[in-house]
């Protein structure tokens, strides 16, 4: 894969420095279960807008992270070329989630409205805080409350009233002035 349609590609990790002389690389996983990154194959490795498919043939835990060996990488010199490359996969490989659960990528771009009908803006990003996820909502340019951005906790049944996936809308119980 070189520069095909990348709209369905999601980043799940990053390659680190080479490890040893046999072509192993350090792996930094961004998945909820860090070892879960190895459940997906093949990996799409991206650098400077170019993508290449690599097959993981072996992996191990190493210190607080992981190391991996690829079929296409045979020595340290070849491994150096992949240092700091993004590890991605096709979103079609993601498992289906139970009712009421969402991937962050599915929430980005949704409009956010209060239960009273006030348009708060569009989900621009999400943050993980430890206790709960937080929606980063970019407010409309003519927001009546002068807000540029709102941080809204993703707490189902208290703040998040409903997520209408097909309508691309999230209804919240939230004060627009906050």
UniProtKB/Swiss-Prot annotation:
The UniProt entry, under InterPro entries, shows: PRC_barrel-like_sf, PRC_RimM, RimM, RimM_N, RimM_N_sf, Transl_B-barrel_sf
Q: Which GO terms describe its cellular component?
A: cytoplasm; ribosome
Keyword set for this entry? Chaperone, Cytoplasm, Ribosome biogenesis, rRNA processing
Keyword Heme included in the entry's annotation = no
Q: Where in the cell is it found?
A: Cytoplasm
Coarsely, its chief localization is cytoplasm
Every copy of the PRC barrel domain together lies at: 99-178
Please indicate if the UniProt record lists Calcium as a keyword.
Answer: no
> Pfam families recorded for this chain?
PRC_RimM, RimM
Gene Ontology biological process: ribosomal small subunit biogenesis; rRNA processing
Q: Which GO terms describe its molecular function?
A: ribosome binding
Q: Which family does it belong to?
A: Belongs to the RimM family.
HAMAP family referenced in this protein's UniProt entry, alphabetically: Ribosome_mat_RimM
> What job does this protein perform?
An accessory protein needed during the final step in the assembly of 30S ribosomal subunit, possibly for assembly of the head region. Essential for efficient processing of 16S rRNA. May be needed both before and after RbfA during the maturation of 16S rRNA. It has affinity for free ribosomal 30S subunits but not for 70S ribosomes.
Q: Give the matching PANTHER family.
A: RIBOSOME MATURATION FACTOR RIMM
The record describes its quaternary structure and partners as: Binds ribosomal protein uS19.
Please state what the annotation says regarding this protein's domains.
The PRC barrel domain binds ribosomal protein uS19.
Protein's UniProt name: Ribosome maturation factor RimM
**Protein's organism:** Pseudoalteromonas translucida (strain TAC 125)
């Amino acid at each position: 894969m070189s520069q095909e349609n990348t709209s369905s590609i999601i980043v799940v990790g990053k390659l680190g420095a080479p490890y040893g002389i046999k072509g192993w690389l350090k792996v930094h996983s961004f998945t909820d279960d860090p070892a879960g990154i190895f459940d997906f194959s093949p990996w799409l490795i991206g650098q400077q807008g170019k993508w290449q498919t690599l097959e993981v043939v072996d992996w191990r835990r190493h210190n607080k992270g992981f190391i991996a060996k690829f079929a296409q990488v045979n020595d340290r010199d070849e491994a150096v070329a992949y240092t700091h490359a993004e590890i991605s996969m096709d979103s079609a490989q993601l498992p289906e989630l139970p009712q009421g659960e969402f991937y962050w990528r599915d929430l980005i771009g949704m409009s956010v409205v209060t239960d009273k009908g006030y348009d708060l803006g569009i989900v621009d990003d999400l943050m993980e805080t430890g206790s709960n996820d937080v929606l980063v909502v970019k407010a409309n340019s003519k927001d009546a409350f002068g807000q540029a951005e709102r941080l809204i906790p993703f707490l189902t049944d208290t703040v998040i009233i409903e997520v209408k996936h097909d309508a691309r809308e999230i209804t919240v119980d939230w004060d627009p002035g906050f």
